[in-house]
Amino acid sequence: MFDSSKLDAYLTGLCQARDLPGVSAAIMGPDGLEYAFNYGFRDGAFTRPVDNDTLFGVASMSKSMTALCACILACEGRLDLNAPVSDFFPEFELAGQPREAATVRTLAMHTAGIPPMEPLEWSIAMNSEGRSESDWLREMKRTAPNKMETIDQIIAYIAHCGYNTLGAPGEVMSYSNEGYAILSYIVDQAAGVPLEQFMQARIFDPLGMTRTILDNGVEAARALSGGNITSLFEVEDGRRTCDDCWSVLPPF
């Protein structure tokens, strides 16, 4: 049995060092909950403490689960991880690379060669109604070529925006939101059902994750949480902001 007080102290130190507003962590074992840690608050007024039942936004944890879905499909012979991305999206291409060079695997491993890009931020800015005004939001709305609300718009941007790739697919690791957006739609095609439905049936339900949901708009999550849900905390220009309007970015 591990010393929970040492883990409490370690996690508390991390939260304080990073000035995190609220954190929840847990260790689950075969017999259920073995350890729980809650720190800070879930609201901007710092009046509502985080507890074991507080819902947090899934954010980019969805990438890990998307990769797991792809691996499940690969194990079942329903998805070839070495298949070119262009097999699923014929319009997909990377500047200066053979059309078939980028594969499902390179998307999943962030090694397709796609550099950091703006489409995710444009999608947030153009589709998240009710977000508090900020310099960032105004700049994203000013520069967005469209609402970035479909996967086709992302693929077209990658193909025609004129950037340089970071290297041939498989050579360079660079975290890519756009790559995972495309991967999620490949999982849709291979599974024959929407990613959210496949993830629910093959990951959440078998693990008893009854309070986990992919919700593009947060309404269902708020209902599921009974109001025990975090606000959205962000840092812009060194200043922390809090917003009850969660990000909406349809193709991501």
Give the positions of each predicted feature.
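Alpha-helix N-cap and coil->helix boundary residues
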Residues: 6, 22, 80-84, 99, ...
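Short, conserved catalytic-motif segment at the N-terminal edge
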Residues: 2-58, 78, 156-167, 218
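Short, surface-exposed loop or secondary-structure junction motifs
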Residues: 96-252
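Active-site SXXK
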Residues: 8-11, 25, 31, 57-85, ...
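Short, glycine/proline-biased beta-turn/loop segments that scaffold the active-site neighborhood
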Residues: 81-95, 206-207
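Residues at or immediately flanking beta-strands
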Residues: 22-24, 84, 172, 213
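Catalytic tyrosine of NAD(P)H-dependent dehydrogenase/reductases that use a Tyr as the general acid/base
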Residues: 56-59, 173-175
